């Protein structure tokens, strides 16, 4: 069993770039199409660790879906981000849905 460091709905930061994001899904290992060595120069150990679907904002405030390795992320300690309220709202909405999902008939 592979344990993930971050959970769905959790706010995280990109380790190198510092961008704020929200985890929307988790893969236990790299699961996109097999990359060519030019596209993704990672070792097997990194590919075997959890990978995260993370929504971040671009410079214009538009949502961007990213796919990042666990090693590329760090925890975000603050819950409120006045400079990016949409990321706070997305995180709250996801956590609320996980706690009280709406059932469809």
From Swiss-Prot:
Q: What is its main location?
A: cytoplasm
Protein family: Belongs to the HspQ family.
User: Pfam families from the entry?
Assistant: YccV-like
Spell out the GO cellular component terms annotated for this protein, sorted alphabetically and separated by semicolons.
cytoplasm
Q: Does the keyword Transmembrane apply?
A: no
Organism superkingdom? Bacteria
Gene that this sequence comes from: hspQ
Where do the record's region annotations for Disordered lie?
Answer: 76-105
- Protein name (database record): Heat shock protein HspQ
- List the InterPro entries: Hemimethylated_DNA-bd_dom, Hemimethylated_DNA-bd_sf, HspQ
One biological process term in Gene Ontology: response to heat
Compartments where located: Cytoplasm
Q: Which UniProt keywords apply?
A: Cytoplasm, Stress response
């Amino acid at each position: 069993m592979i344990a993930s460091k971050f959970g769905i709905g959790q706010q995280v930061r990109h380790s190198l770039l510092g961008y704020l994001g929200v985890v929307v899904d988790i893969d236990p290992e790299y699961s996109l199409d097999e990359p060519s060595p030019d596209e993704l120069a990672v070792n097997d150990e990194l590919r075997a660790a959890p990978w995260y679907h993370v929504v971040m904002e671009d410079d214009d405030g538009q949502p961007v879906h990213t796919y990042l390795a666990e090693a590329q992320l760090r925890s975000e300690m603050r819950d409120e981000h006045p400079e990016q309220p949409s990321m706070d709202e997305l995180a709250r909405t996801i956590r609320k849905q996980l706690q009280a999902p709406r059932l469809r008939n």
